[in-house]
Amino acid sequence: DHLEINAEEISPKIMDSLAYFYDEPFSDPSMIPTFLLSQSVKNYCTVVLGGDGADELFGGYPSQLRAMRVHSMLRNIPISFRGLVSQILLEVLPVDLRGYSLAHSLGVDFNNISSSFNPLFYKKEMKYLLGDLFARDIENLDQKKIEPPLKPKTYLNMLNMSDFKSFLTEDVLVKIDRSSMAHSLEVRSPFLSKEIIEFAFTRVPDQLKIHQGRKKIILKLLGKKILPKKFIFERKQGFSFPIDQLLLQDDWSEYFAEKILN
């Protein structure tokens, strides 16, 4: 009752198709399985339903859960003190140290929607890659100020809004749109209807999104009425792809060596 696609059988030439249809730099490896999934589904139908927006609206990301835990531990410590400690630690610690992200988290401003727990690059990395001048110019590009149409009432609401206005629109929906349209497949996203968006941001309390280590609670309460329990309470797997393993295969390594060296 399902179709399996073996990653080891995927040709590296799929990258040529992705480059053509995306037509811009895109760093999400799940673009590959999304493209292949759209290609396979088109053999059976032309319109499908997608679940995009559910994680952003109802608290489904592990990063949101981690941020909530850090917030509960640090919210009563003044940002001026936390920021100073964070700045000192980030200067002396190596970026690849396990605790570096925690040192960064100390300086997160819980009142600023653009203050990120998961920056694309840390300041030290940008300075190393770009030099002082350019690093200062683009320092906040991945933490751009997000002006929400609805003012977040709680910290979780702020996290949801940040993911909704950045990751969803600039990664997830781009990936879905390019992959599906490449195969003339229409993907409809019920969670992105105006009514559900307003409902999630204005009427659903935090306790029905993330609470006591559980995520997306309200959707699971609804889902367990019609879906088997194993689907409701299974650990979130995401849509990852073994790109590191593929690059070890001869055909993939030769493909990228040729593209990069030429």
Language model features with spans:
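A conserved beta-strand->alpha-helix junction
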Residues: 1-21, 136-142
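Short beta->alpha junction loops/turns
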Residues: 7-8, 54, 216
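A conditional alpha-helix N-cap/helix-loop micro-motif detector
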Residues: 8, 30-31
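Active-site adenylate/phosphate-handling loop in enzymes that bind or generate adenylated species
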Residues: 11, 36-96, 167, 176-196
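Active-site phosphate/pyrophosphate- and oxyanion-stabilizing loops and adjacent acidic/basic residues
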Residues: 16, 35, 39, 198, ...
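Short low-complexity, flexible loop/linker segments enriched in glycine and/or proline
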Residues: 17-21, 42, 64-66, 246-248
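Short, polar/flexible loop-turn hinges at active-site or ligand-entry regions and domain interfaces
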Residues: 24-27, 72-76, 206-210
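Adenosyl-5′-phosphate
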Residues: 30, 47-49, 97-262
